[in-house]
Amino acid sequence: MANIKSAKKRAVQSEKRRKHNASRRSMVRTFIKKVYAAIAAGDKDTAQKAFNEMQPIVDRQSSKGLIHKNKAARHKSNLVAQINAMQ
């Protein structure tokens, strides 16, 4: 444990930020899973709606650095391709 006051403060701030980021990361994963679940169920309308809800959230979190921009782009690209391939 830190002895210096500023180091203690940084440790508290870091833990607070870690919990906040974990919550946000979990939210992003949940939105992505909803789209995959709709695709697996074969429901194109639901998949499209879930994707439209997911996209701005993934973009926002990638712009804030929570997830890498390439990872966000990869998820969106894969999901759009799967939705378009549905009948």
Curated annotation (Swiss-Prot):
GO cellular component, one term: small ribosomal subunit
Region (Disordered) location: 1-26
Keyword rRNA processing listed: no
Record's keyword terms, sorted: Ribonucleoprotein, Ribosomal protein, RNA-binding, rRNA-binding
Keyword set includes Secreted: no
Pfam family, one: Ribosomal_S20p
Molecular function (Gene Ontology), one example: structural constituent of ribosome
Family annotation (InterPro entries): Ribosomal_bS20, Ribosomal_bS20_sf
Any single biological process term in GO: translation
Purpose of the protein: Binds directly to 16S ribosomal RNA.
NCBIfam families, per the entry: S20
PANTHER family assigned: 30S RIBOSOMAL PROTEIN S20, SMALL RIBOSOMAL SUBUNIT PROTEIN BS20C
Family membership: Belongs to the bacterial ribosomal protein bS20 family.
Protein name: Small ribosomal subunit protein bS20
